[in-house]
Amino acid sequence: MLPLRDDNPTHHRPYVTLLLIALCAVIYFVVQPTPFASTTADARFEYRYAAIPTEVVHGSPLSTCAAASGILGVTASAAGCKQPGSIVPYAPAKHTRLAIITSVFLHASIIHLLGNMLYLWIFGNNIEDRLRPVGFVLFFVAGGIVATLGHVLADPSSQIPVVGASGAIAADRKSVV
């Protein structure tokens, strides 16, 4: 059974909550490769814009060979890389620290997006009401950053992109309790 709302009254319209939901939806449906795109196109997008633990730790983008092996799900040599340690960056313009924030707004699937947005709607309006719009945005982004960094600490060598607002929404849920 999924909740659709809560019983906590709010005193203000949750404009920021609605804006965050709209932003995540627009990014998923307009900016990210379509759900019908190949998984390779989606993976390429995620490797360019999502936080990747090993990149966050080292402060530099993955090499082309490391990203290719991650996108294809094979070893670097099977991906056609003769020198697995190649230092040519896959996404040279990628700002690995900024990706910690941008990854909060990316989602892996429609179910991932809908689940996160449902819980953002249920809990976000109460937090926004309490913290006011600017405080809520700061709290939401801080929750996403802390969750992403927690993921990085749990597996700092991971080359798998971290996406989704689950950490930011978990912070919202915990603050309601």
Identify the residue ranges that each predicted region occupies.
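A detector for small-residue-rich transmembrane helices and their helix-helix packing motifs
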Residues: 1-177
